[in-house]
C-alpha cells in the first residue's frame, strides 16, 4: 500500500508541475521579439517611421557634423578663416573715433615735451632744483636755530647738576595744583636718632664708672 501511495503522489506532483508551467505560459503576452525597446529603433531601416522625439536628436547630430566639416576644411582653405574674421568684425561695433595712446618718455636732462593740446612746456628739472635749494637752506637754518635754543635751555640745568646747586623754590609752586601745601625741602644732612645717641652716652658713662672699681679690686689683690 505504501508503494502504491508513493507512486500516486509522484504522478500528482508531475501533473501539478505541468499545469503550473501552462499557467505561466498563459500569463505571457506575445513573444519577446515583438517588443521594441529604444535601442532597437531604426534597426529595421529608414523606411519605418521613427517617433517624433528622435527627430530632434537627428537634427542636432547633423548640425554637429557640419561644424566639424567646416573646421577641417578651414585647415586647407585659409580664405575661409578670413571670411569668418570679417563676419566677426561686422558684428563688433566700430570704434573709429578712438586713437591709440602714445606712451611719452621724459628726457632725463632736457625740458619736458609740450602737450598735444598746444599748451606751453613745463619747467625744466634745473629750475625745479633751484626752487628746492632755498627751501632746504631755510630748513637747515631752522634746525640750527632750534639746536642752539635747546642747548641754551639745557645749559642752566646741566650747570645745576654739575655744581650741586639746588633749584630755586619759585619753580615748585608752579607745578603744584592750587589748594595743596608746598613740599618741604629735602636736606642732605643725616639725622641722628635720639635712642641711638642716648644709648651711646649711657654706655660711655657706665664704662667710665666701672673703670675705677676694677682698678681698686686689682690693687687689693696685689696687696694681699
Swiss-Prot record:
Sequence ranges assigned to domain CRIB in this UniProt record: 29-42
Chief localisation class: cytoplasm
Keyword Cytoplasm included in the entry's annotation: yes
Region (Disordered): 38-224
Subcellular location: Cytoplasm, Cytoskeleton; Cytoplasm
InterPro entries: CRIB_dom
SMART domains documented for this protein: PBD (SM00285)
Induction: By auxin and abscisic acid (ABA) in roots.
Top-level taxon of origin: Eukaryota
Tissue/organ expression: Expressed in columella cells from the root tip and epidermal cells at the base of lateral roots, leaves, stems, flowers, anthers, pollen and siliques.
Pfam families registered for this protein in UniProt: PBD
GO BP field: cell morphogenesis; cellulose microfibril organization; cytoplasmic microtubule organization; pollen tube growth
Biased composition (Polar residues): 69-84, 114-132, 144-155, 215-224
Outcome recorded upon mutating residue 40 to D: Loss of interaction with ARAC11/ROP1
Subunit structure, interactors included: Interacts with ARAC11/ROP1.
Further remark: Over-expression of RIC1 in tobacco germinating pollen reduces pollen tube elongation.
The protein, known as: CRIB domain-containing protein RIC1
Organism (species): Arabidopsis thaliana
